[in-house]
Amino acid sequence: MRTPATVVAGVDLGDAVFAAAVRAGVARVEQLMDTELRQADEVMSDSLLHLFNAGGKRFRPLFTVLSAQIGPQPDAAAVTVAGAVIEMIHLATLYHDDVMDEAQVRRGAPSANAQWGNNVAILAGDYLLATASRLVARLGPEAVRIIADTFAQLVTGQMRETRGTSENVDSIEQYLKVVQEKTGSLIGAAGRLGGMFSGATDEQVERLSRLGGVVGTAFQIADDIIDIDSESDESGKLPGTDVREGVHTLPMLYALRESGPDCARLRALLNGPVDDDAEVREALTLLRASPGMARAKDVLAQYAAQARHELALLPDVPGRRALAALVDYTVSRHG
């Protein structure tokens, strides 16, 4: 039965004792991050701690800690370091993304660029990357290589998104590739490092990495659906943000391929950023009624099935069941 004692970061792990151990693992990651970031010069501190103190889902540290439950040493100190490295990289990308997107709000608070300007936000993100690099050096050359490869994928995905879809590339294939690079790659690295440093077998580590990539892609698709389907800000941004910014997510791309009576109006609305609140509401209403939403949810279900296939081949231990609960949470939160 779901109780507060069994829930960690919104995910019902089913067992209060196991959940307490996982919660403690995530708390160790947060404590290490806090310790490392507070060592920065005071000229950095307010902007550097801005997003960290704003909270967030801590999805990536949670995935690291849960992946570590597959190995025989889930509480190894290196698992904590790996979780901190992954979350610092994630926070750094948020600072940089908000500058590129000119976002004004992040996690219910003014974004760093809105509060201090672009230069400060970029430098805060850079410092987070520097701190993550210093931490990962503790884990040895293989971990450094994994993180370097992940950096490359993150930047490639951002560049691919920034330059847009060329005429000879399918827009939906492009979208899914960008999501895998920008979101799936980092969660895949979380699974790989969590498995590695808990002593999981090589085969299990590879499976956890693949699982992370699939779950990361599903997580982003769910966020994109929430941005249209939800009346609240459960994705961490205002509903309709993607419409306002002119960002074409999976539900929009499918909706734009439809040929119903409302499609011409929807195409006109989604032709670029939408500033007018009434037009944002109109676009959201049309998107919610479009078959494109159902198609996007079908794709999300396919990724969930792929994740469950990977899970089924992991050992039947509490960690696997917890990862299955996380997959269910990822898919179900779009409502």
Curated annotation (Swiss-Prot):
Mg(2+) 1 binds at D97, D101. The keyword Lipid biosynthesis applies. NCBIfam families: NPPPS_Mycobact. Mg(2+) 2 binds at D97, D101. A motif (DDXXD motif) lies at residues 97-101, 223-227. It comes from the Bacteria. Belongs to the FPP/GGPP synthase family. Its EC number is 2.5.1.85, 2.5.1.10, 2.5.1.29. This is Nonaprenyl diphosphate synthase. GO terms for biological process: geranylgeranyl diphosphate biosynthetic process; isoprenoid biosynthetic process. The keyword Cell membrane does not apply. The lineage of its organism: Bacteria, Bacillati, Actinomycetota, Actinomycetes, Mycobacteriales. It is an enzyme of class 2 (transferase).
